[in-house]
Design a protein with these regions (language model features):
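Conserved alpha/beta-hydrolase catalytic His-Asp/Glu region
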Residues: 53-99
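Short beta-strand/loop motif that positions the catalytic acidic residue
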Residues: 109-111, 115
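Hydrolases whose catalytic domains are alpha/beta-hydrolase-1, hotdog thioesterase
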Residues: 7-12
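Conserved beta-strand scaffold positions in the cores of enzyme catalytic domains, especially
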Residues: 21, 107-109, 124-128
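Conserved small/polar residues in nucleotide/adenosyl-binding loops
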Residues: 1-5
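Flexible "cap/lid" loop of the alpha/beta hydrolase fold
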Residues: 15-52
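Short loop/helix-cap segments at secondary-structure boundaries that form the rim of catalytic
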Residues: 13-15, 102-104, 116-125
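Catalytic active-site module of serine/aspartate enzymes centered on a nucleophile-bearing elbow/loop
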Residues: 127-155
C-alpha cells in the first residue's frame, strides 16, 4: 500500500488475518517517522497546518523544483485527488497519532533509496529500490512488474 494506506492496511491486518502485508513508501512503526514528524507529533504542531495549503504547496514545489517535481505533483493530484478538509484533518491526526511501536512480523516493506518523505536513515528491514522516490510506485513500474510477483509468491 502507498503512504498513509500502508498504515491503514497494517491496522486492518490486526483485525483480518493475512499471510503477509506489503507496504510501499510507508513506515512500519511510529519510530520510523523522520525527526521532524516525531517533533510535530509530540508538539501537535501538525494541527496548525491549514489543510487548504496543500494546493498552494503543490504549486510552490513545482515552481521551485522544476518540471520533474511538477510532474510528480500532477501524478499526486491525479491519484490523491480526494481533498475534503475534514478528511484531511482526520487523516493528519490519525497519521501523527499512530501508536504502532513495533513492526508487525508479517509486513514486507518496499522503500525507495531517495524517498525524502520517509528517508531510509530512519527505517529498518526493508527492500530497497535504488533511486526510488516517495512516488516510485508511479515511476518505477518496471521494477515493480519484475519484482513484486516474486515478493508476493515467496514464502
Amino acid at each position: 500500500m502507498y503512504k498513509r494506506q500502508g498504515i491503514i492496511v497494517q491496522e486492518i491486518s490486526k483485525i483480518i488475518s493475512f499471510k503477509k502485508v506489503i507496504i510501499i513508501s510507508s513506515v512500519k512503526s511510529m519510530h520510523e517517522y523522520p525527526i521532524h514528524m516525531q517533533i510535530s507529533r509530540k508538539t501537535k504542531a501538525y494541527k496548525i497546518f491549514p489543510v487548504n495549503w496543500i494546493d498552494d504547496f503543490e504549486a510552490f514545489v513545482g515552481f521551485i523544483f522544476g518540471p520533474l517535481a511538477r510532474k510528480q505533483m500532477e501524478h499526486s493530484r491525479k491519484y490523491l485527488s480526494y481533498r475534503d478538509p475534514f478528511y484531511l484533518e482526520w487523516a493528519l491526526d490519525a497519521f501523527f497519532n499512530w501508536k504502532q511501536k513495533k513492526p508487525l512480523n508479517y509486513v514486507i516493506h518496499i522503500h525507495g533509496t531517495y524517498d525524502m518523505v520517509f528517508p531510509i536513515i530512519y527505517l529498518k528491514e526493508f527492500i530497497p529500490v535504488k533511486s526510488g522516490t516517495h512516488a516510485m510506485i508511479i515511476f518505477k513500474k518496471k521494477w515493480f512488474n519484475e519484482n513484486l510477483p516474486k515478493i508476493i509468491m515467496d514464502d
